[in-house]
Amino acid sequence: MTASPSKLAQLRELSVVVADTGDYDAIKRLQPVDCTTNPTLVKKALDLPVYADLLERELAWGRAHGGDDRTTTVDEVADRLTIGVGVKLSALVPGRVSTEVDADLAHDTQATIAKARKFVAMYAERGVPKDKILIKIAATWEGIEAARQLQLEGIDCNLTLIFNRAQALACAEANVFLISPFVGRILDYYVAQGQTPASIDEDPGVVFVRTVYNAFKQRGSSTVVMGASFRSTAQIEALAGCDRLTISPDLLEKLDAEHGELPRKLSPGNANNAQITPIDSDSFASGLAADPMATEKLVSGIDTFAKDLHALRKTIADKLAG
C-alpha cells in the first residue's frame, strides 16, 4: 500500500511554498520555490559554516576599505553580506529571493528607491538578474510609493508588514508584485487583548488573509498574496491555496511529517476584473488610524526590523574591530 503524501507535498500542489530562512542546508533539504530573508535571518545565517568564506571575504573587504568613516564601512559590509547570502540562496531556489531594504528608511521614499536600485545593481554584478529577486519594503505609504516607482523600472517588490486592508489595496493599486500579510502577528495582538479565537476559521490573521485574497481575485489584481508569520501548521493549512506561503523551516518540517488530507481553502474563483479604487495618503492614514492593531503592529514591526539591522551591523563592527 502506497503511503499517503505528506501535507507539505499536498500544499505544494495548492500554493507556491516559500522558505522563511537563510539557512542554506534547510533550503537544500526542503526545496522551496522561493525564500525570504531579513537582517535577523542573515545574522543567523552568517553563523553557519557554509557562509564562513563569504563572511571572511567581506570582512577583509571592510578592513581594506575602512577609512575614517567607520559607520559607512560597516553599513557597506552589511549590504555586501546581505547580498552575498542572497546570491548563494538564489543558486538553490528556482524562484526568487526576497532581500530587505533598511527598515530605518521605511518613511523615506527616495532613500528606499536608491537602496533598492543599489541592491539590484549589486546582485547584477554578482551574476544574479533582477527577475530572481524581490526587494522587500515595509508597507508604509512612503514604502508603497517607492514600490510604485520601482515596479515601473521593472524591479519587483515584496511589500511586507501588511496588517490592514488599506495597506493591501494601496499595494494592489500601485501594481506591487507581491504583498506579505502577517498572519501570526495579527493573532498575537488579539490574544494579548484576551481575544483568543474559538477556531482556526475565526483566527483574525487567517480571516484577514482570506479577505485580502478574495478581494484581489474579485478585482482581477495581479498582485501576489503571500501569507507570512505563521504560528502553527493549522494557520498554514487554513490558507492552503493562497498564492504563496512563506514558512519557517520548523513548520515546513512539521508539515512534511504530517499526513492526512489537506483540502484547498482558497480558490481564485471567477474574477470579475473590477478596478481597485485608488487610495491617497489621507485615506491610507485614516484607514490605519481606525485600526489600532495595524497601527501598533506596523510601528513595532518596523522597529523590530530596524533593531535587527542594527544588531547585524554591530556584529560586523565588532568583527572588524577584533
From Swiss-Prot:
It is found in: Cytoplasm. Keywords: Cytoplasm, Pentose shunt, Schiff base, Transferase. It is an enzyme of class 2 (transferase). It catalyses: D-sedoheptulose 7-phosphate + D-glyceraldehyde 3-phosphate = D-erythrose 4-phosphate + beta-D-fructose 6-phosphate. Pathway: Carbohydrate degradation; pentose phosphate pathway; D-glyceraldehyde 3-phosphate and beta-D-fructose 6-phosphate from D-ribose 5-phosphate and D-xylulose 5-phosphate (non-oxidative stage): step 2/3. InterPro entries: Aldolase_TIM, TAL/FSA, Transaldolase_1, Transaldolase_AS. One of its GO terms (biological process) is carbohydrate metabolic process. Its main location: cytoplasm. It holds the Pfam family TAL_FSA. Belongs to the transaldolase family. Type 1 subfamily. This is Transaldolase. The lineage of its organism: Bacteria, Pseudomonadati, Pseudomonadota, Gammaproteobacteria, Lysobacterales.
